[in-house]
Amino acid sequence: MNNDFNSWDKYCDYLWYDQKINIWLDISKINFSYDQISSLENKFIGVFSSIKELEAGAISNIDEKRQVGHYWLRNPSIAPNTFIKDEIIKDIRDISEFGDKVLKGIIKNNKNQTYTDVLWIGIGGSGLGPLLITEALQENSVGLNFSYIDNIDPFLISEKLDELSDKLPTTLFVVVSKSGGTPEPKIAMNIIKRHVEDKNILWNSNAIAITMKNSQLYKKAKLENWLKIFNLPDWVGGRTSITSSVGLLPLALINQDVSEFIRGASIMDELTRITNIKDNPAALLSSAWFFSGNGIGKRDMVVLPYRDRLQVFSKYLQQLVMESLGKKFNRKGKIVHQGISVFGNKGSTDQHAYVQQLRDGIDNFFCVFIELLDIPDDNKYFGSENPKEFLSGFLQGTRSALSNENRQSITITLDKLNCLTLGALIALFERAVSFYAELVDINAYDQPGVEAGKKAAAEILEYQKKVTELLNNGEEFSIKKITSLIENSTSEPIFFIIRQMCFGNDDYLIKGDWSNPISIIIKKNSK
């Protein structure tokens, strides 16, 4: 077996397909040989063993001392105890029943009105997962209309509230936060709650929490008698929460088949428990990542789905892959700086954007093409200019143009996009991430960099409070003086805070030149 990208034998030998879900995986255009695949067999013995331990309930997130159980969500029978098993089954049933009753108008607001919309408040995986679900699967005029607050940009919040306007009384406000203490969803929730109550709308009639039992958010929702609380277990991480209530509730509210989505993920999970590398799609996919990046993440992953409904999938994978695999240390404490950078948009748009560099520029990437074989039922106007055939031609042409320049790629083909195949596709990448992490000996389930960022942000927020307190005294302050009065602060973040607070704000008098921060003198306006 050679490394020839255009070898038909290599393509046939490494093409994976499963007829239950009609998904193909082709890694033949990655630079590897048969001998290299064989060389990973011993490593994969350890990989399969570690995944088996994880699924059995081992403490896999060492930093947080918790289990990692998103695979149980798709097959409760493998959960480590009957309590967790029964909890999963109950949660799935509750979500399906709730969605059905909302869509049938059995559950209504306090004014006996049927719900029409959802304003979803969630950060990271708590926002990206639901967005992927609705963008990929929602049919026109079916189910509730979804809007998202996935950032605390004040313009975004104002825009979404303005768009909903008259529909606010019939909007469900879904707040997702496992701990209930994450600042962004908490701040967004408080702003939206005040706005809603100012419009004389009863918040608790429309509010839903997705959170961990006994969290801050859980207690608040209980105390205020919110419409519903759905469980988000301690053992589910944000980036792998899409088969929990975080992803299942949107499915139910757009009238999609919750059980089929779970079944697709479960089928893929089972296929990736096969211990023969060539018969295991996640083993093949993670091996392709490993060989392309020489086991040290030398190449970026460029995700190109050739279907608009999967455009969000690139962003979804960005978090799943980068937050899981971007690690400074391996499990032995050695500095390794592992990771795979992910970006992408959609084909064929990207052929007119950055594919030029992919073919002729620096060779620091591999592509993941995602192809769909189906076509809309209403295609009578297509005539001889069938867009499906053109799209397929563009994909194959781009793939061929890249391989002719020895640029590496992976191709995943789905017969159609539905609950079953989307569930399977997501599970494939989740499993591949787990496998790759084991191959390079890192923990895929912690996020020390994210936690460090949260800690640093909390310090800045504390500085902001202290700056405000100082300026409220009515005295004049330089950046240097403020810095000296706030313990452990430095001048640069204080300047950022002052500029954010005071620039263009008539509440403050400013002397000096903004291009020379040392000259800036600030005083609270006494008017």
Curated annotation (Swiss-Prot):
Broad EC category: isomerase
Spans traversing the lipid bilayer: none
Gene3D superfamilies per record: Glucose-6-phosphate isomerase like protein, domain 1
Active site: 323, 352, 454
Cited PROSITE patterns: P_GLUCOSE_ISOMERASE_2, P_GLUCOSE_ISOMERASE_3
GO terms, molecular function: carbohydrate derivative binding; glucose-6-phosphate isomerase activity; monosaccharide binding
Record bears the keyword Cytoplasm: yes
Subcellular location(s) per record: Cytoplasm
A Pfam family hit: PGI
EC numbers: 5.3.1.9
Catalytic activity: alpha-D-glucose 6-phosphate = beta-D-fructose 6-phosphate
Family annotation (SUPFAM superfamilies): SIS domain
Main location: cytoplasm
Biological-process GO terms, alphabetical: gluconeogenesis; glucose 6-phosphate metabolic process; glycolytic process
Pathway membership, UniProt: Carbohydrate biosynthesis; gluconeogenesis; Carbohydrate degradation; glycolysis; D-glyceraldehyde 3-phosphate and glycerone phosphate from D-glucose: step 2/4
A GO CC annotation given for this chain: cytosol
Sequence similarity: Belongs to the GPI family.
HAMAP family (alphabetical): G6P_isomerase (MF_00473)
NCBIfam families membership: PRK14096.1
Record's function text: Catalyzes the reversible isomerization of glucose-6-phosphate to fructose-6-phosphate.
Protein name: Glucose-6-phosphate isomerase
Organism of provenance: Prochlorococcus marinus (strain MIT 9515)
Lineage: Bacteria, Bacillati, Cyanobacteriota, Cyanophyceae, Synechococcales
Chain's gene name: pgi
